[in-house]
Amino acid sequence: MEHIQGAWKTISNGFGLKDAVFDGSSCISPTIVQQFGYQRRASDDGKLTDSSKTSNTIRVFLPNKQRTVVNVRNGMSLHDCLMKALKVRGLQPECCAVFRLLQEHKGKKARLDWNTDAASLIGEELQVDFLDHVPLTTHNFARKTFLKLAFCDICQKFLLNGFRCQTCGYKFHEHCSTKVPTMCVDWSNIRQLLLFPNSTVGDSGVPAPPSFPMRRMRESVSRMPASSQHRYSTPHAFTFNTSSPSSEGSLSQRQRSTSTPNVHMVSTTLHVDSRMIEDAIRSHSESASPSALSSSPNNLSPTGWSQPKTPVPAQRERAPGSGTQEKNKIRPRGQRDSSYYWEIEASEVMLSTRIGSGSFGTVYKGKWHGDVAVKILKVVDPTPEQLQAFRNEVAVLRKTRHVNILLFMGYMTKDNLAIVTQWCEGSSLYKHLHVQETKFQMFQLIDIARQTAQGMDYLHAKNIIHRDMKSNNIFLHEGLTVKIGDFGLATVKSRWSGSQQVEQPTGSVLWMAPEVIRMQDDNPFSFQSDVYSYGIVLYELMAGELPYAHINNRDQIIFMVGRGYASPDLSRLYKNCPKAMKRLVADCVKKVKEERPLFPQILSSIELLQHSLPKINRSASEPSLHRAAHTEDINACTLTTSPRLPVF
């Protein structure tokens, strides 16, 4: 028996019994706190002889399949006799109930009071069980890599790879596992104790012991780690895992090493809503009247105030639509959609200059941690379907990172839908070519075409169709670095009929593909339609003008291009335009979309053309400019010091 007690002390101390969440006067759970019913063996019957009565001892069956024999002295109560035996096992009498096993009725027991005189029970067999309403549960550890900044709740040092309890949120390093508190707080049961402190146990009709004082509850909450307090300060409902083995289960395997937490446990679900716990503590401290508690309805929480104690099946069947219904509810803090953090409050952005307006919105220069471009979209009173579709597209746009793509910085949904992007100091390609008439050299024009194809190839690799590719949406940033903007956003670039998204011709007429103008398909936008728009941009680069400049009627252009009667005049291209570039322009603006190349092929063609262009290499005989001064000095020195040769 001393060996068992000594081993149990080692296990308890190894798991940091002194660092438990509750103080010493409250309930402390052992390492394994499932309510394993003690199974008496047939060989145990009849072992109790008259010698036990003469030796003043009582045999006691304890939780977790343990047993002990205690000595009884006159004047001692059950509480005094069993205190030491329970304490060395990490238990407290306030958390347990004691029963006397009836010898005449096998399997039946009668509950005793802890103040009962122990002398009257000499020679009897007693059993100690956990109380049903006591919030005892075990940690549910899972190995986790913390991608966001996190710190160990034990040593308060940086934590990258470690463990985290799925129930209470306790996180720690593997080498700190010996200091983890043994008790994991079951918040649903604590909530019941706070709201119904005078509740009784209805199974046997025997009143339950007095509930824990409110002071202990406050202390237990205040002694939680900082990260756990922050976790339970939000008003959301959490779903965590906790082990729930059968009460008749047995400890068939040895205790695991204390250096590694047990991360393999059967899981069921528990719901936690800590705002109600805080409200209950506050209301209880202000007024302890029953009316203050009864005024709160039972259906304020998605999880409910009270949960009946029903056996949890090993595998719970889920309704077909339960998954989607749960996702539509308030998201837990740890599982919140990451696009939430990309939403910007309208009050944080300061708009200054109106840059211009287009088919789908107005662009402003603004201030939000620096210069940004804010595009307020032309969507009035968006429906919930439009708002959700807009957020879905934003979730795709926020993942774009490329040197030739405008950096997406966030979005706004209050009052108006708006997107916030990187600010480009340079002008658009349209302004350079047709307003300022900047004179680019041919190799510069080819490099602009290459960068544009490179950015579009990246967007298509992300399954993003631009839908409005034109020279107005191509910006030259800090010299000749191409930045493509206003991509995606099919929600804004479509017409909505009720809750249904209906495609319509979008974009500028000169850059619209023939199939987009005709709108014969439900969704005419494709990678090939973007290629056609890119071909018109190539025409602008290589011709220095817009296509169909001789046609002044917009409707005529729409009719002729849609019918296939008109195409860009390739004879207007520059005379020094390479033949490979002329062929590429002709391929991109073909009337049949299946005949157009895709951007990987376009990009490789332009790169091959760049490598084939003749380059002017510096002459090897030309002196370096930074060495010219030294050369002059040497020549002067040579001329002045050369000796005169005698003349014969």
From Swiss-Prot:
Binding site for Zn(2+) 2: C152, C155, H173, C176
Modification Phosphothreonine, positions: T268, T269, T491
Chain intervals for the UniProt region annotation (Disordered): 205-265, 281-335
PTM sites of type Phosphotyrosine: Y340, Y341
Domain Protein kinase: 349-609
GO terms for MF: adenylate cyclase activator activity; ATP binding; identical protein binding; MAP kinase kinase kinase activity; protein kinase activity; protein serine kinase activity; protein serine/threonine kinase activity; small GTPase binding
Modification type Phosphoserine: residues: 29, 43, 233, 252, 259, 289, 296, 301, 338-339, 471, 494, 497, 499, 621, 642
PROSITE patterns: PROTEIN_KINASE_ATP, PROTEIN_KINASE_DOM, PROTEIN_KINASE_ST, RBD, ZF_DAG_PE_1, ZF_DAG_PE_2
CDD domains: C1_A_C-Raf, RBD_CRAF, STKc_C-Raf
RBD domain: residues covered: 56-131
GO biological process: cell differentiation; death-inducing signaling complex assembly; ERBB2-ERBB3 signaling pathway; extrinsic apoptotic signaling pathway via death domain receptors; face development; insulin receptor signaling pathway; insulin secretion involved in cellular response to glucose stimulus; insulin-like growth factor receptor signaling pathway
PTM info: Phosphorylation at Thr-269, Ser-338, Tyr-341, Thr-491 and Ser-494 results in its activation. Phosphorylation at Ser-29, Ser-43, Ser-289, Ser-296, Ser-301 and Ser-642 by MAPK1/ERK2 results in its inactivation. Phosphorylation at Ser-259 induces the interaction with YWHAZ and inactivates kinase activity. Dephosphorylation of Ser-259 by the SHOC2-MRAS-PP1c (SMP) complex consisting of SHOC2, GTP-bound M-Ras/MRAS and the catalytic subunit of protein phosphatase 1 (PPP1CA, PPP1CB or PPP1CC); this relieves inactivation and stimulates kinase activity.
EC number of the protein: 2.7.11.1
Record's subcellular location: Cytoplasm; Cell membrane; Mitochondrion; Nucleus
Cofactor: how bound: Binds 2 Zn(2+) ions per subunit.
Ranges annotated as biased composition (Polar residues): 239-265
Binding site for Zn(2+) 1: H139, C165, C168, C184
Annotated zinc fingers (Phorbol-ester/DAG-type), start-end: 138-184
Region (Interaction with PEBP1/RKIP): 331-349
Regulation: Regulation is a highly complex process involving membrane recruitment, protein-protein interactions, dimerization, and phosphorylation/dephosphorylation events. Ras-GTP recruits RAF1 to the membrane, thereby promoting its activation. The inactive conformation of RAF1 is maintained by autoinhibitory interactions occurring between the N-terminal regulatory and the C-terminal catalytic domains and by the binding of a 14-3-3 protein that contacts two phosphorylation sites, Ser-259 and Ser-621.
Family, per entry: Belongs to the protein kinase superfamily. TKL Ser/Thr protein kinase family. RAF subfamily.
Subunit (UniProt): Monomer. Homodimer. Heterodimerizes with BRAF and this heterodimer possesses a highly increased kinase activity compared to the respective homodimers or monomers. Heterodimerization is mitogen-regulated and enhanced by 14-3-3 proteins. MAPK1/ERK2 activation can induce a negative feedback that promotes the dissociation of the heterodimer. Forms a multiprotein complex with Ras (M-Ras/MRAS), SHOC2 and protein phosphatase 1 (PPP1CA, PPP1CB and PPP1CC). Interacts with LZTR1. Interacts with Ras proteins; the interaction is antagonized by RIN1. Weakly interacts with RIT1.
PANTHER family, sorted: RAF PROTO-ONCOGENE SERINE_THREONINE-PROTEIN KINASE (PTHR44329:SF22), SERINE/THREONINE-PROTEIN KINASE TNNI3K-RELATED (PTHR44329)
Protein name (Swiss-Prot/TrEMBL): RAF proto-oncogene serine/threonine-protein kinase
Organism from which the protein derives: Mus musculus (Mouse)
Gene it is expressed from: Raf1
